């Protein structure tokens, strides 16, 4: 039995799951948090750090040695400082949340004169290397005041890949095979066949060269190349005639001989017959070692080595040349006894390398390297050193080439080597053994006889010969995840490499001029690289903060786009499609609709990345048909070797598989296998889906396309005023809410000491207090009415009362879209599926007015409006209440500084911040000059540029922030805000100190009461300390007490030290905060002052708003109908929403119907509990009824709620929380069955069929037949008509065409396009059409005149020449065709 936490006891969700969960859902943000923690290694001792992340990047670039070699800069260690501002301050001030990185480096200068490398002097120093962004505990970064998420990238793993062109290159449709070595950084190396079966190579996708040039550049001769790639047939040449072949029977298979093949007189194969496998076996059995063949058999064969006349030294035939009659005669003449030829055939031993050597123009290693230099650097004259250096740097030095640990592992596995570790560069035995430097000797001694490039070419030839298979690049074994930490490390390394170049130049100066490390290193390149990555990389995205689910999903997203990834336009169908290997790793449902479909994926619930970055998913081990509780993670490559059963496979109590044939997966196929064959079993039915899809109840009854929409639309739900838990959920709502970080969870257990709307104080349990300095008090500040990235409202509400006992992890406060710690995205609405006067045509939704009245879908949106005062050429702008030509009424909401009051209710067009801008001097009329002379300068040299409420917006001012540049005097409002902020901080610190002090005194009291005194204030020696005595004593006098008991004396001293330490710490923290608040702000160049005004906008639901269920059943509200007109049930309850029944069958999302039935049952059970409470039923009866709800069926794992754990008060409290409906969980792919839903309906005393008689609200008549009615969790999506509705009379125009701009953001007009023109033409509305195309659009004079005419009350219109026609004329003139307009 599970024990229930304080939060869970408030409300338990009835679970219909039939399969016990072995593995808890892992921490959902682990992919982000763990990756960045490994990158920083901030809490790891310097000596213990692994070679990854910052440490790895610094170690790979240092030491930096000067060009002369007499000075070196070595890396010692690094430490991260404390961030200057905390997260809240960074959000407020628009700053980035990060910590300074300080690296300790050592400058070593060697003595030039000494013959050995003697150290002249060493200088060690700490160098500042810029700010490193810190991750918040919820996996986000704060960059320039906004929360951003670095999305993980799914890219092709480094390593070697074999592929073919699918017959698309050549017209014959012949498959051209290719191989590609992809490093983590460095040049790509490709090998490819051409249609004539010669093998070519490309470096970095440049022009192709015969592969033999690359091999020759490595130092191989023709003979060595042929020896590596071919098996040799040896022929002994008889002095007279005929040839003896050293027989390897297997090599004759498939050949047709022109002579009889005999064994001691008996013919094995007749002339002209093909040699088959049977003949080969006979030959092997006969034991013939040599075979006499005629000279013709040798003609046309290819020599494997040079044939040289031993006496004269003359070259008779070179390697790779064909044998002909003349050559055989020459061989006999020269007394050549034996020659070797290549064993090739057209079937499975292609002469590919031999063909390639024929087209290779180079002869020596240097020629080959020069040829590669010419290809890489066309136009540059090659020298010997340049060619050798370029070739070496391409693949053989770590500075320029890095396969990475992953790449080496994939490479070695693919070419069939045992060990997975190795060098990050490409290794070749011949090339490195010919070089004579220390590094090469080290590599040769370590790696010996292997050769990477040869192995790849051999592998490619094998595949071309029909042995071996090409790789599937869409398999997850060939795609890996690059998370935040790795990307940040790469960027950091790039910055360091830039620094390295500059340091190398300066190091030579350091020798002579005695520079320090700080003077050598300039941190700018590193800081710039990091800032660019976090601020503007394609994968650094503005966080989707609509609701907790959208945050979690955004952090768990995997994108195939981004630097080094795919592009939308070039990605084909295969990359986007669901692949067999996605099972349990990537969600098969959740992906965006539109151009990114399939390129952006979501991590499955249980998936994680392994040390190499490949996705892996957990499985339960099965031993001899018995399922164990041992869990193993397998990657996509590993799971290929095993037979894996589904999670819903039937087992008995001992875990033995009961079915005689179990449905399994093996190598991507679905099979039925006996239990003994099964190796593993899925851990959970929801293993294949992502968090968003796992939140859709009855997902198994929905069509995949609709499920996709349902998963995506949950992310767009706007948090409502009062969150309401879904009646029908899936059981992971609590996990999602907890991991998203929007709720406040107790860090340690204890008793609630204080609660108010903004703060919760917990007195920690004695057992959980760590160390002597820990006062055992946890203070949680709550977020109040803060704006999210999507302008929705983030607000936390406490759930606990003073005196409540909480344990670690309990939910103390709800955030947006959470209800008692469970995710609650929408509201439970009473729904009827029926047509209603055409108002639910085409997915429209009919809504009851009651929903609006009860504010069920009212949402609060917080808009941030900014007013900036800049320094202009004509003088500085000023924020003030003194604005020209504005009525008193317009200024009545502003204070004397010109800033709106908090709490003011404002509407579109109202002034929020008064601002005046200097105007350019214009020519003055004599009258103006006179007035100026009399009344002084000021009046007309400024214009009004105040911040006003944008059109279509109204709300209440809830916060104002004033930022003033350093050195500029703050106005009165800024001082007020400052004082308020300081007071708030002071109160916080005072309260904290008071609570801590109280806790220390309370603990001390328990330790000294009852002890005998030696000395003290107002007490005699030998008396016993009592509670009343301590109550009458001043707190400071407690410390004067001295007892006989040494332990008590120690406790008093310890308490005094603790209080003094806290006092000192709090004073220091307060002065730090105070100086932060009062210091000037760091504003953009040219900005003197910035005022931010926050408006809270209340949005009620209305026609045109978009709503949706969780099954992809979306629609737009068509009408809001009075309650009395809505269809109602027998007991008079009107329905809230009427949906179109025709929206269900064609969409095949039947899940919504099951949800409605079960939701109705849940609500009905809640009503029954309410009736019991109202009737003051006995607790025993209540317990019995709850037992009947939760524990009726023993097959359900989620059942067996142990109600005996609940005290009577706890049970009553839970029952009160259940009156609104008993929440149910129907887990994904393991949900409630039809019988269970019917049973619940019976228990709730509702019709088991789920349908009831409805009556027409207009007439009161019953409808013809019964209707499906029930409760569905319905969401309001962030597509609000208020945000889209927009009207324009006059506004901005485009400069070139003089037509109005488009779109709400530009305050644009509505386009009257080609088809609309046709419509007016069809009506014959000529004047309307003329007006549309001229004065209402781009006839400049006409529209100005029209405006004047309307003002004068003269309603005439004169249409002139549209500007777009002038543009057309100009465009035609640019083609040198002159068009002139003649007056008629």
Curated annotation (Swiss-Prot):
GO terms for biological process: DNA-templated transcription. GO terms for molecular function: DNA binding; DNA-directed RNA polymerase activity; ribonucleoside binding. Transmembrane segments: none annotated. InterPro entries: DNA-dir_RNA_pol_bsu_ext_1_sf (IPR042107), DNA-dir_RNA_pol_bsu_external_1 (IPR019462), DNA-dir_RNA_pol_su2 (IPR015712), DNA-dir_RNAP_su2_dom (IPR007120), DNA-dir_RNAP_su2_hyb_sf (IPR037033), RNA_pol_bsu_bac (IPR010243), RNA_pol_bsu_CS (IPR007121), RNA_pol_bsu_protrusion (IPR007644). It is an enzyme of class 2 (transferase). The keyword S-adenosyl-L-methionine does not apply. Belongs to the RNA polymerase beta chain family. The RNAP catalytic core consists of 2 alpha, 1 beta, 1 beta' and 1 omega subunit. When a sigma factor is associated with the core the holoenzyme is formed, which can initiate transcription. This is DNA-directed RNA polymerase subunit beta.
